Amino acid sequence: DAATTGSSCYISDIVDVPTVQNVLMVSDASRFIIAFGCNDYGSATQDPMLIRWSGQEDPYDWTPDATNQAGSIRLSHGSAIIGVQQTRQEIVVFTDSSVYSMQYLGAPQVWGTQLLGDNISIVGQNAIATAANVVYWMGVDKFYAYDGTVQTLNCDLRRHVFNDFN
C-alpha cells in the first residue's frame, strides 16, 4: 500500500476515511489520525458526537479489524463536539455541554473516554489554550481550567468580558 511503498494515494482511494468532521488531529504520543464529529463507516451523514481514528501510524487504514487499531467511539453528553486540546497525558474533548478526557488504552479498546464534567460550555473551537499542563477555556458565561479536575475560574476579567461586551 501507499504507506509502506511511498507511492502516492488519493483520499478518494482510502476506504472508510471520514469525509466530514468538525476537528481532525494527529495524536502526539500514540500516532493516530483522529476525526471528531465525523461520518460513520459506510455513511456520508455527519454524526456530530462520533470520534473515529485510523490505524496506528497508518493514515490509510480506517476500517477496524483484528490486525489494526482503527476504531470509533460515540460520546453521550452533548449534541456536538466543538473542540479538542491535546495534552501530555490525554486529549481533552469539548462538546456543546460537557468535557471529556480521551486516553490511549492500547488494544483491544484502543481509546477510552471519561466524562470530566457536564453542564459546561465552550464558546467555540478556538477558545482553548494550554499553559504549564493546564487546559484553559472560555465558556459562554465563565472561564474554566482543567488540571486533572475541572474548575471555574473567578477573576475580574470574567465580569468585564461577560457583562460589558455587547
Spans of model-derived segments:
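Beta-sheet-dominated scaffold domains
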Residues: 40, 76-166
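Surface-exposed loop/turn elements that mediate protein-protein interactions on large endomembrane-trafficking
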Residues: 2, 6-10, 43-72, 100-112, ...
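Disordered, low-complexity "stalk" and linker segments at domain junctions of extracellular
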Residues: 1-31, 39, 68
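Short, solvent-exposed secondary-structure boundary motifs
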Residues: 13-16, 73-74, 127
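Helix-rich catalytic cores of soluble enzyme domains
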Residues: 24-66, 71, 77-92
